[in-house]
Amino acid sequence: METFLFTSESVNEGHPDKLCDQVSDAILDACLEQDPESKVACETCTKTNMVMVFGEITTKATVNYEKIVRDTCRGIGFTSPDVGLDADNCKVLVNIEQQSPDIAQGVHGHLTKKPEEIGAGDQGHMFGYATDETPELMPLTHVLATKLGAKLTEVRKNKTCPWLRPDGKTQVTVEYRNEGGAMVPIRVHTVLISTQHDETVTNEQIAQDLKEHVIKPVIPAQYLDDQTIFHLNPSGRFVIGGPHGDAGLTGRKIIIDTYGGWGAHGGGAFSGKDPTKVDRSGAYIVRQAAKSVVASGLARRCLVQVSYAIGVAEPLSVFVDTFKTGKIPDKDILALIKENFDFRPGMIAINLDLKRGGNFRYQKTAALGHLGRDDPDFTWETVKILKPKA
């Protein structure tokens, strides 16, 4: 039996790039909560003792940017210089301007266009992917890496492992076989966890706790065997972390945000962007399309691409590939997708309820992946059952 290895990684909410994603999306939430027509393009960067937010925001909302930055950092666990950032005493820099009137006129006609007329906020191409290898219809490598990261955060915050600090990374290698184009996981080959910790804990304790409280509860026993390799804090020590250890920037973790290296990626980041930005809304609708194809039993694996021109509502192209796993020809699946999904940005925003912010709606997406999540706020995960014409 011919097999191959594939690897996906994830990072925790305390990773500096992910901190920035969460700040950008917390600001988006605050704007949309008060003004659903807010136009937001918010970037964040961070380094030792400093967080800066910058970009273009046009909104009727009254937003205290500094408070949002501090609250977000505090919520993650950055409460002292020792852990990498002190939310209450760090410098917060804000440089926000209005959306360019040229873009505003071309995309939404200064808010005068009807939803079906609203153009894409920029050019670009986005991909959606789904695979039947997990209940989430997501790649197992990505699901496990992400769940390990979520468990690390959980056992840090509930004090099961009080030595943990917010920053951390995970990586999982799975051995697969290709079954006529479908991906079948056989076993977990390697588990890698690098987590920030305090000065008191020994490397032995770290390895023991990670195996007991993080790996065992997350990775199903059927995938682990005596050949599975564990690299637990392989660099030795990881005391200095967060923005003190590395600079952070919004939009640096786009593969972690999506499919862990499976499928494809058009290059556009998600966080800090309102739904007129097709980098985000386009990627969400094609995930819904690909997931619906697999959930409807039309294919075991599916990739969907959509592309846009700035200011133009209708997509330039829609593409489907089922990797030879389709029950009907790909051209028929493409026709079904076009009949059942409206790819115009204004209609995506309505159909997926993307103008609704607040209550951490977008901030939740900014750590632990935007896709494959079981949460009613992740409207793009709702399956539409697609039925081929008789």
From Swiss-Prot:
> How is activity regulated here?
Inhibited by products of SAMS reaction (SAM, Pi, PPi), substrate analogs (cycloleucine and ethionine), and alternative nucleotides (GTP, CTP and ADP). Strongly repressed by PPPi.
Q: What is its main location?
A: cytoplasm
Quick one: which pathway? Amino-acid biosynthesis; S-adenosyl-L-methionine biosynthesis; S-adenosyl-L-methionine from L-methionine: step 1/1
- S-adenosyl-L-methionine is among the record's keywords: no
Q: Which UniProt keywords apply?
A: ATP-binding, Cobalt, Cytoplasm, Magnesium, Manganese, Metal-binding, Nucleotide-binding, One-carbon metabolism, Potassium, Transferase
* Residues given in the record as Mg(2+) binding sites: 9
Instruction: Tell me what reaction this enzyme catalyses.
Output: L-methionine + ATP + H2O = S-adenosyl-L-methionine + phosphate + diphosphate
State how the cofactor is bound.
Binds 2 divalent ions per subunit. The metal ions interact primarily with the substrate. Can utilize magnesium, manganese or cobalt (in vitro). Binds 1 potassium ion per subunit. The potassium ion interacts primarily with the substrate. Potassium can be replaced by NH(4) (in vitro).
Please give the biological process terms from Gene Ontology that the record holds: one-carbon metabolic process; S-adenosylmethionine biosynthetic process
Entry keyword Transmembrane: no
Q: Outline the subunit composition.
A: Homotetramer.
Show the HAMAP family listed in the entry: S_AdoMet_synth1
| Similarity remark | Belongs to the AdoMet synthase family.
Q: What does this protein do?
A: Catalyzes the formation of S-adenosylmethionine from methionine and ATP. The reaction comprises two steps that are both catalyzed by the same enzyme: formation of S-adenosylmethionine (AdoMet) and triphosphate, and subsequent hydrolysis of the triphosphate.
Protein known as: S-adenosylmethionine synthase 3
Report the source organism. Answer: Catharanthus roseus
